[in-house]
Amino acid sequence: MDVADAHVGQLRVRDEVGVRCQKLFLDFLEEFKEDGEIKYLKTVENLVNPDRSTLEVSFEDVENYNQTLATAIIEEYYRIFPYLCQSVSNFVRDRTSLKKSKECYVSFVDVPTRHKVRELSTSKIGTLIRISGQVVRTHPVHPELVLGTFVCLDCQTEIRDVEQQFKFTNPTICRNPVCANRRRFMLEVDKSLFIDFQKVRIQETQAELPRGCIPRSVEVILRAEMVETVQAGDRYDFTGTLIVIPDVGALQLPGAKAEIGSRHKQGDNAAEGVRGLKALGMRDLNYKMAFLACSVQVTSSRFGGTDMPMSEVTSQIMKDQMTPAEWNKVYEMSRDPRLYQNLINSLFPSIYGNDEVKRGILLMLFGGVAKTTQEKTTLRGDINVCIVGDPSTAKSQFLKQVSDFSPRAVYTSGKASSAAGLTAAVVRDEESFDFVIEAGALMLADNGICCIDEFDKMDPHDQVAIHEAMEQQTISIAKAGVRATLNARTSILAAANPIGGRYDRSKSLQQNIQLTAPIMSRFDLFFILVDECNEVVDYAIARKIVDLHSHIEHSLDQVYSREDVLRYIMFARQFKPVIQPEAMALLVENYGHLRQRDTGTTGKSTWRITVRQLESMIRLSEAMAKMECSEEVTERHVKEAYRLLNKSIIRVEQPDIHLDEEEGEENENVMDIGEETPEDTPRTNETEENDQDTPAVAKKKLTLSFEEYKNLSNMLVIHMRNEESRMESEELDREGISKTELINWYLSQVEDQLESVEELMERKVLIEKVIDRLIYHDQVIIPLKQAKLGETDQDDAGDQDVLLVVHPNYIVES
């Protein structure tokens, strides 16, 4: 609507629809009541302040008051917006001492329908709509001429309140009836009205983006109090209208200037007349769509992510936002005794095994508690996880599932990402040529998760760029005269391949991956996945993959739906557990163990243990407490955090030990070291009876977890070394302990746990298998086969009485 075109002399065209809406809206402001009082009377008093000029109105109130008025505002918003602002000005002036020269504006919130950026089309121009998107670029604030006062240079007539149509607009004609001037006007700056103006660019969010499509973006124009209220990387709801503005940037392309210059290079044609105006580089004025916003609100989806300020959210607020069925489900999940296991099964149903990795990622989703010290130093609460492993160990699958599951997650590849693409870039605006900041992946994932695949393929100078973001959670920029510190409160989930494609167990973690020590120390958890040839594991993985391809619905073992898990994580994140004194003492003790192991000559740590690992333990303990909706961090939470941290730092991820597979290797090794073959070994009645009893027990598969196997082997080794020390101190003429004595000692240690003869026989077979594995596979125990004078081969009946000693170079690992 160009109001200036309507002026002929002193006449103005009367818009009946606008005037009618102005009266109805003024009646709404004066009559709408809530709790017996006029709702907008109190907020009007704030508009007297010089820095306030906008009245915020809930669109739901307008719908409840007059449906016809609400429909007119929706359909003809841009047309009647000046009349609505005039209603606000009249309403304020009637009740306060507002200056006549001050303009007031209206902004609507709670508009029911939300549109995506991709859905914007010319049919929505001029209507009131609400769009949502992620801010990727913010421009500096500029003054905008809204109502200009001009002076006619022919008759000196003053022409007031000439509306500007998104570009500098002169009056169409002088308002003096006797003056026909249409071109010669001068702007009176001191009598014109300027307001603050800021342009931002929003982009489709990752969740709304169709697969394989480039994200769409749109320019959003902010005015008055709305300037400087948005930050790059955050998601907002913008309420306003779609407008068409001149594409000034297209007029400034270099082609026109070059063509004009070529026409005037030769001076001999200077006296010629002007011909061929189109060849002078004149361009048609193009237009583009933009969004004129009247209100800005942070996107606060019900349970879609962490967009709500977590410092303001309480359990009661979140309970009020749930339906009774949703709240009952959250309460039921919080009381689940197997919640830890059920959550990881529901979160990664299509990935077999790797439970420790799943637990680490689950705790990363809950996060720790961010804290601020008295010196205003921020201690991060986000947990960073790195997965290192051989090809085809589901590293990228973990990242893709997390990026699809988390509502505010950004997935990127390390090789295809630069330092500016990860942090922030300083680019030049195509219209004003000012330098502006464009958000990178870490800023776009603010309050979310940034998944970086092929992390080891990044260039070293690009890895250095995220040092600050990983620990201080800020990004500092000093480029092209722009100095800024931006938020990057994100958790980083990275995946990397070892050097050479395969993990070398003989080397430490730092020797296996191309990451610097500063980067490695900033990760809270490192998980190492090794692709080992194991018949049982390979069969289970193959069965899982075939099931997924054949009947996907039936192969997923999900206890809770993804919506239930997301709702529960959102609810649990608002807890801020406090560390109890007992847990505090255990944290210090565990940290001391890690440091001692690191400084010792026999240390097995993958890198230096620093205070950052202590902070990692604290964050993991807080995440465990959050998962259980607990207000306190107890010793149990600290033990699980220490176990996870210890597992990721100290040793490679190990599969279960299948003792049945060692029988063949044992027989081969017996022949290799010169023992008698089973056919040559004399058989006694006692051994025949044992052979008859053993198969019935041994038919059961013997499988131990790696931790159980190590605990059992350490128990045997420590006892054998104690016996060796005792024999040496007593000067006994004997070396080592027999296998029978070792088995009997172990059975005496666990006799309290045995309730039947069958359990005793099972435990006996188990310890025999463990000892055989320690002898023939791990070579931790050495059998002594030294024959003495007077002994024959028949005296060595079987290997039960073989003397066993511990390898002198073996070191017990805790």
Curated annotation (Swiss-Prot):
KW Phosphoprotein (keyword) present: no
Ranges of residues in domain MCM: 339-545
SMART domains the record matches: MCM
Keywords assigned: ATP-binding, Cell cycle, Cell division, DNA replication, DNA-binding, Helicase, Hydrolase, Metal-binding, Mitosis, Nucleotide-binding, Nucleus, Zinc, Zinc-finger
Record-level GO BP terms: cell division; DNA replication; DNA replication initiation; double-strand break repair via break-induced replication; mitotic DNA replication
Gene Ontology cellular-component terms listed: MCM complex; nucleus
EC number: 3.6.4.12
Cell membrane recorded as keyword: no
Segments of this protein annotated with the region Disordered: 656-696
Comp. bias intervals (Acidic residues): 659-679
UniProt: ADP binding residues: R612, E615
Zn-finger (C4-type) residues: 152-179
Residues annotated to bind ATP: S392, T393, A394, K395, S396, N497
Cell compartment(s), UniProt: Nucleus
Family: Belongs to the MCM family.
Function in brief: Acts as a component of the MCM2-7 complex (MCM complex) which is the replicative helicase essential for 'once per cell cycle' DNA replication initiation and elongation in eukaryotic cells. Core component of CDC45-MCM-GINS (CMG) helicase, the molecular machine that unwinds template DNA during replication, and around which the replisome is built.
Assembly notes: Component of the Mcm2-7 complex. The complex forms a toroidal hexameric ring with the proposed subunit order Mcm2-Mcm6-Mcm4-Mcm7-Mcm3-Mcm5 (By simililarity). The heterodimers of Mcm4/Mcm6 and Mcm3/Mcm5 interact with Mcm2 and Mcm7.
Protein's recorded name: DNA replication licensing factor Mcm6
